[in-house]
């Protein structure tokens, strides 16, 4: 394997150093000022300055192009489109998008915690809160996996295996997801030192009651992520691919961003970038499992780090 040129290594080191300095400056600003707005404005300015510095390098712009536009064009080249499809109304696209709308509506109005509280108002059960998360996760499996799979079973010529559930592309490109996790991990570790983080995670506040509680919650959480990846990066992307090609990614990120409404704005905006990256990788590798691995790995890491600030298992006192 050819070694990267020294100029490339030097550039990467400068970029890593500049990002580190920017992050340190943002955290220094948070500790030095009591003004929330000053911290927010300063963080935005520092972030924009860092972005401008990174994009000022032609080599970096070339790298960005290689992992974005070049990949989308490759997806379009791989997509088999019948000439007869051009300019025609697609019943398949209509069905796919209607199923997406119905499934998301069910999540909001029936599969939510508020709906669980309406249907099961008796909170006296020891595991009432955990059952609430089972309700939430179960509806994700139903709406994101079961309903789409039933839909595909009735669509002529469609095979569920074609909807990015193969492991073949996952193993071949596992290193990409390992690099992504390595980049995300330090950010998660830094975030875990904040009070806001410790008061938010784990979402199941009784996760420290017992090992059974913890791993039951993690299993429900993982099932939800698997379902989400199949729905957005499998069912929706592959369902639209023949007619839209790589443009299907940009259709997908709209509802994917919207399911994050109600969360902090940085997380919701971050979902746009995450959707683009995971969508591109899913279409290129024809596998959703990398996205599942990233989601489950990051979520489990966040919970484990958050548990450091929780009372001990069996103490009778719960997280946040």
At which residue positions do the language-model features occur?
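Hydrophobic alpha-helical transmembrane segments
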Residues: 12, 16, 94-98, 173-178, ...
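Interfacial transmembrane-helix boundary/kink motif in multi-pass membrane proteins
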Residues: 3-15, 67-102, 123-138, 158-187
């Amino acid at each position: 394997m050819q070694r990267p040129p020294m100029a490339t290594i030097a550039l990467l080191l400068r970029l890593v150093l500049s990002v580190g300095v920017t992050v340190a400056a943002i955290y220094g600003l948070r500790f030095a000022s009591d003004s929330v707005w000053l911290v927010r404005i300063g963080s935005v300015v520092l972030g924009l300055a860092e972005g401008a510095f990174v994009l000022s390098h032609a080599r970096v712009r070339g790298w960005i192009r290689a992992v974005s536009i070049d990949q989308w064009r490759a997806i379009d080249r791989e997509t088999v489109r019948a000439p007869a499809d051009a300019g025609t109304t697609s019943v398949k696209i209509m069905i796919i998008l209607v199923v997406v709308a119905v499934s998301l509506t069910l999540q909001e109005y029936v599969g939510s915690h508020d709906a669980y509280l309406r249907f099961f108002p008796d909170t006296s059960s020891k595991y009432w809160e955990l059952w609430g998360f089972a309700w939430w996760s179960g509806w994700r499996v139903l709406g994101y996996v079961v309903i789409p799979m039933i839909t595909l079973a009735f669509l002529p010529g469609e095979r569920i295996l074609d909807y990015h559930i193969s492991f073949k592309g996952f193993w071949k490109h596992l290193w990409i997801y390992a690099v992504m996790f390595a980049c995300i991990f330090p950010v998660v570790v830094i975030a875990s030192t904040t009070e806001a983080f410790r008061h938010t995670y784990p979402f199941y506040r009784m996760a420290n009651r017992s090992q059974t509680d913890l791993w039951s919650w993690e299993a429900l959480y993982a099932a939800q992520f698997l379902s989400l990846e199949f729905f957005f990066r499998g069912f929706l992307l592959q369902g639209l691919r023949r007619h839209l090609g790589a443009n299907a990614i940009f259709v997908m990120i709209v509802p994917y961003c919207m399911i994050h409404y109600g969360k902090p704005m940085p997380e919701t905006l971050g979902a746009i970038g995450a959707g683009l990256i995971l969508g591109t990788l899913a279409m290129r590798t024809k596998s959703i499992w990398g996205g599942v691995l990233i989601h489950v790995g990051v979520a489990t890491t966040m919970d484990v780090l958050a548990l450091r600030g929780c009372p001990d298992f069996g103490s009778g006192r719960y997280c946040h």
